[in-house]
Amino acid sequence: MMNPLIIKLGGVLLDSEEALERLFSALVNYRESHQRQLVIVHGGGCVVDELMKGLNLPVKKKNGLRVTPADQIDIITGALAGTANKTLLAWAKKHQIAAVGLFLGDGDSVKVTQLDEELGHVGLAQPGSPKLINSLLENGYLPVVSSIGVTNEGQLMNVNADQAATALAATLGADLILLSDVSGILDGKGQRIAEMTAAKAEQLIEQGIITDGMIVKVNAALDAARTLGRPVDIASWRHAEQLPALFNGMPMGTRILA
């Protein structure tokens, strides 16, 4: 039997009805023809940004990571574990998929500690207990997990969703796909790079070809590949017809090698 698969959703996917329709149609097709257990992990930067804008709150980033002051963590939790998570559950319901909404702290699935005081309520994710999610998977549910976590001291933390997905993949012994707006990592000429090693990534970062949020994504994928001891795919949701093959292990974007 294949390992479970974690599909991490990112970019504007949550903001686009067309993207969600393509994704959930592909999930329905895949679940009808394959037995592989699936888990969705999501962030929702665009949902948070819209909310912050509406509330006239500043968005600060440091090295591609969102700074989360104490007076903003409740708002961000509401956006990610509330709006973003329940939007995905609503799409699952619309497509007759039995889904369960979770956050990283449920069942202690992912352990979270504070990453850096300067970043505020931003968490570092580490593997936790697989019991709850395995139980849901065994009963045919699709877990949909937001990237909000909680420390042992009971502090809510905003966790980078790529890193949250990596920690959960390590917890479950699962494979990982990072789905976003881009078809993979592009070279300086806009061409997709099929495979990427750490050395190649460092070279492209030095050359300024991989920048900003993509640095965080590539580093998260490299970290994931090292942690999991197997390749991690960065791919796009745009080609819905290719998604079932991607979910089954066919490389469609950039395959990150440990």
Swiss-Prot record:
It is an enzyme of class 2 (transferase). ATP binds at residues 181-186, 209-211. GO terms for molecular function: acetylglutamate kinase activity; ATP binding. Signal peptide: none annotated. CDD domains: AAK_NAGK-NC. It is found in: Cytoplasm. GO terms for biological process: arginine biosynthetic process via ornithine; L-arginine biosynthetic process. It catalyses: N-acetyl-L-glutamate + ATP = N-acetyl-L-glutamyl 5-phosphate + ADP. It holds the Pfam family AA_kinase. Pathway: Amino-acid biosynthesis; L-arginine biosynthesis; N(2)-acetyl-L-ornithine from L-glutamate: step 2/4. NCBIfam families: argB. Homodimer. Belongs to the acetylglutamate kinase family. ArgB subfamily. PANTHER family: N-ACETYLGLUTAMATE SYNTHASE, N-ACETYLGLUTAMATE SYNTHASE, MITOCHONDRIAL. This is Acetylglutamate kinase. It comes from Escherichia coli O6:H1 (strain CFT073 / ATCC 700928 / UPEC).
